[in-house]
């Protein structure tokens, strides 16, 4: 049996399935409630039941005082809803609402695609999580190597299993280690998050996503966030790749097109130095681009060139969101 939960004051609602905690359900739905440990230790997910009924389904070390119990406080990470319920609960509305964290993790999976691309999946250590918003980046540190900042390619809906996309850079020790010696179960430190490149969840405007190469990673994160929020406005993904280098997650993007009525996917072959050509093509595809939100991700020159085209076509600056790839 499923029930509906509403978080106030935002008014965000989501479904809680039988056996799920309220926190698990909220994250799965793409929301960002306040929380810390997710295991009943810190108490940061404490929220007040306004109406409805809840039941604790997990033990927690954090002690809720008797006065707060009488007021209806519970821990979202340890309680489920037994019927339609409303909570008074804080949510992260902006990137600045997410605290800096440092956690240990291990390599869960590593998929090398040819000689120049890798998809890295890591798992945060047991009993810990990493809070972030889709589109943000974190710093990864392997013992003995300089740290590497990378955008998370997965949604914050899962704060334990994180995905990253890497292009090979022979001048970067982290990159060379990933393509040469890194193996499953290797340990690393994760610190973050940083960045303002996040989904505008309150906007109902159509969306254009424009990515180059591995800068598809933060775009993928944001797309998954939008899907989990069940946003219904049209979303158009344009993915630029160098000639003779097909998109490394082409099948994934095609599957989104097949599954979602409001999603379209286009591949573009281009040199990074001529990104304005494809930006003009996108603007021609969407004559009313001034009424869109545009997310552009790639190398600095690519982003600057594409953004200039969109702005010249009437896109307001506050509807343009940029992610510029970082050097090692």
Please report, for each region that a protein language model flagged, where it lies by residue:
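N-terminal pre-ligand scaffold of iron-sulfur
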Residues: 1-33
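Residue-level "contact hotspot" at macromolecular interaction interfaces
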Residues: 15, 36, 80, 131, ...
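Short, charged beta-turn/beta-strand-edge "cap" motif at the junction between a beta-strand
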Residues: 93, 144-146, 192-197
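Ferredoxin-reductase
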Residues: 99-187, 241-243, 270-271
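Iron-sulfur (Fe-S) cluster-binding segments and ferredoxin-like electron-carrier domains
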Residues: 25-34, 44-93
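FNR/FR-type flavoprotein reductase catalytic core
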Residues: 159-160, 166-328
């Amino acid at each position: 049996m499923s029930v509906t939960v509403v978080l106030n004051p935002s008014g965000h609602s989501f479904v809680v399935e039988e056996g799920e905690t309220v926190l698990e359900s909220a994250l799965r739905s793409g929301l960002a409630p306040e929380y810390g440990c997710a295991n009943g230790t810190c108490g940061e997910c404490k929220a007040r039941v306004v109406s409805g009924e809840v039941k604790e389904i997990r033990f927690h070390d954090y002690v809720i005082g008797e006065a707060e119990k009488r007021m209806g406080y519970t821990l979202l990470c340890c309680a489920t809803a037994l019927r339609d319920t409303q909570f008074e609960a804080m949510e992260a509305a902006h990137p600045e609402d997410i605290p800096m964290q440092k956690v240990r993790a291990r390599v869960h999976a590593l998929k090398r695609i040819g000689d120049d691309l890798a998809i890295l999946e890591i798992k945060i250590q047991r009993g810990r999580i990493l809070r972030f918003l889709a589109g943000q980046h974190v710093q990864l540190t392997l013992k003995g190597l300089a740290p590497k900042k990378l955008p998370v390619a997965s949604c914050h809906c899962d704060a334990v299993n994180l995905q990253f996309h890497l292009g090979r850079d022979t001048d970067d020790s982290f990159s060379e280690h990933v393509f040469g010696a890194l193996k499953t179960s290797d340990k690393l430190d994760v610190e973050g998050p940083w960045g303002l490149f996040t989904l505008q969840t309150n906007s109902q405007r159509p969306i254009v996503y424009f990515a180059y190469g591995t800068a598809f990673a933060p775009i993928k994160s944001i797309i998954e966030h939008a899907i989990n929020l069940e946003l219904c406005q049209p979303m158009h993904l344009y993915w630029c790749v160098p000639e003779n280098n097909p998109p490394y997650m082409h099948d994934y993007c095609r599957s989104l097109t097949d599954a979602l009525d409001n999603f379209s996917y286009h591949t573009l072959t281009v040199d990074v130095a001529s990104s304005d050509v494809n930006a003009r093509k996108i603007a021609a595809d969407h004559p009313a681009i001034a009424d869109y939100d545009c997310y552009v991700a790639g190398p600095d020159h690519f982003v600057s060139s594409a953004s200039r085209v969109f702005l010249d076509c009437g896109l307001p600056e506050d509807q343009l969101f940029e992610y510029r790839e970082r050097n090692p």
